[in-house]
Regions:
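Bacterial N-terminal signal peptides
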Residues: 11-21
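N-terminal beta-strand/beta-hairpin edge segment
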Residues: 54-72
Length: 145
């Protein structure tokens, strides 16, 4: 029996790094069913500052709809992501961020963040602009308190 346990350990050590991304993707960071919603702690960090808040995402048959609100209740942005066209549409953006070049960057980064979250990662970094996005899921147990 000890001879087989060595082989089992070797197989597990080899397969574990290959299986972990699949398990993380299966766990899913995005809402998985129509009508399901998820809450996330959001942290957007830039060179000169950052923003934190809460994001609520809702999935329907066409895609995802999300809204980010800071701790004071001020809406930072509302967006939607269409599965079919693989595009993000910004519905509203906070006044100081409502510039065409910021909206374009947000649109592109949110699209890449959705792809990263689909693959099991909760963060995305825009190296060109030096912006780091982190969407950490909030457990339902944490919101019940």
């Amino acid at each position: 029996m000890p001879r087989y346990s060595k082989w089992i350990r070797v197989v597990l050590l080899v397969l574990m790094p290959l299986l972990l991304p699949l398990v993380a993707a299966g766990r899913g960071l995005l809402p998985s069913a129509d009508g399901q919603e998820r809450l996330y702690n959001v942290r957007i960090e830039m060179e000169k500052g950052g923003m934190t808040g809460v994001c609520m995402m809702l999935r329907d048959s066409t895609g995802l709809h999300g809204s980010v609100v800071n701790e004071f209740g001020v809406g930072l942005m509302s967006f939607s992501y269409a599965f079919g066209s693989d595009k993000v549409r910004l519905h509203s953006v906070f006044g100081k961020m409502d510039k065409w070049y910021i909206r374009r960057t947000l649109r592109r980064d949110l699209r890449r963040l959705v792809h990263a979250m689909r693959d099991g990662s909760a963060t995305y970094t825009n190296d060109r602009r030096g912006i780091r996005y982190a969407f950490t899921p909030i457990n339902e147990d944490d919101t019940a308190r």
